[in-house]
């Protein structure tokens, strides 16, 4: 089973850049090391490194908290 987080909701709980903490949005693109997120406010997009944060992700109706370094790999290699 491939875990694809595109169109999942994400909230940044902790990040190396404090300006990004508490930001929420929808994941529109995922690469091996980054998420591209469409923020709710002002229809802005940001690209963040997965390894630099802790996130709350709502995936298929269930929310979970995960350290980003655990997501650093190609989506199709995750099981």
Swiss-Prot record:
Question: Taking the first listed entry, what is the main subcellular location of this protein, grouped into a coarse class?
Answer: cytoplasm
Quaternary assembly: Consists of a catalytic RNA component and at least 4-5 protein subunits.
Provide the GO MF annotations for this entry: ribonuclease P activity; RNA binding
> What does the UniProt entry say about where the protein is found?
Cytoplasm
Database matches in InterPro entries: RNase_P/MRP_Rpp29_sf (IPR036980), RNP1 (IPR023538), Rof/RNase_P-like (IPR023534), Rpp29/RNP1 (IPR002730)
Reactions catalysed: Endonucleolytic cleavage of RNA, removing 5'-extranucleotides from tRNA precursor
| HAMAP family assigned | RNase_P_1
Supply the source organism's classification: Archaea, Thermoproteota, Thermoprotei, Sulfolobales, Sulfolobaceae
Question: What does the UniProt record say this protein does?
Answer: Part of ribonuclease P, a protein complex that generates mature tRNA molecules by cleaving their 5'-ends.
CC terms in the record's Gene Ontology section: cytoplasm; ribonuclease P complex
Q: Which family does it belong to?
A: Belongs to the eukaryotic/archaeal RNase P protein component 1 family.
Enumerate the Gene Ontology biological process terms.
tRNA 5'-leader removal
Organism encoding this protein? Saccharolobus solfataricus (strain ATCC 35092 / DSM 1617 / JCM 11322 / P2)
The name of this protein is Ribonuclease P protein component 1
Keyword Nuclease on entry: yes
Q: Does the keyword Cytoplasm apply?
A: yes
Q: What is its EC number?
A: 3.1.26.5
